[in-house]
Curated annotation (Swiss-Prot):
Targeting presequence: 1-25
Entry's Gene Ontology BP terms: mitochondrial translation
InterPro entries: Ribosomal_uS3m (IPR026146)
Name assigned to this protein: Small ribosomal subunit protein uS3m
Naturally occurring in which organism (per UniProt): Caenorhabditis briggsae
Record lineage: Eukaryota, Metazoa, Ecdysozoa, Nematoda, Chromadorea
Length: 166
């Protein structure tokens, strides 16, 4: 009995050293799935791989949150970002490009900068656009108690922003 137990133990130890299973290749994080008829729009930022975030997309990562004077707690930053995204989606509902996913929120010192693209509609006149920008900046500044600057660009259509279709 003792001999058979030793045989089983040596067999288990040998199995631990050699792996015979195939790899599952489940390292596809951040990769967008392609469609059968290439209808899904990709912008330049969406087309980049996640490991290029610090190289090709570094302008998205410049922030001042690690400086001692401007440090904020993580839940506060996440809540502020969600408030800004929901406000922009609600205030410019007909003008959003790529369903509002391309809104970039940057923090430089005490200033919150919101960048992105809006689709130009023929119904908007220039006075209304300036009023909407001014109101949005002022409302978000009062709500978040820090200066907010909008850097939103208007494009003719979503195809202008498209980098690739998959």
């Amino acid at each position: 009995m003792l001999r058979s137990l030793q045989h089983v133990e040596s067999h288990i130890n040998q199995c631990r050293r050699i792996s015979t299973t195939s790899t599952l290749l489940k390292n596809r994080a951040g990769k967008t799935k392609s469609t059968s008829n290439r209808t899904q729009l990709l912008t330049y930022e969406m087309a980049q791989k996640p490991h290029h975030i610090g190289v090709r997309k570094s302008w998205l990562t410049w922030h001042s949150q690690n400086l001692e004077e401007f440090r904020q707690s993580q839940p506060l930053v996440v809540a502020q970002d969600e408030v800004v995204r929901r406000f922009i989606r609600g205030f410019f509902p007909q003008n959003l490009v790529v369903s509002g996913n391309e809104i970039v929120i940057k923090r430089r010192g005490n200033v919150l900068i919101v960048a992105g693209f809006l689709q130009y509609s023929r119904r908007l006149d220039i006075r209304r656009i300036y009023w909407m920008f001014g109101f949005a900046e002022e409302f978000l500044s009062i709500l978040l108690k820090q200066p907010v600057k909008l850097e939103l660009s208007f494009v003719e259509s979503e195809e202008t922003v498209a980098y690739n279709y998959i």
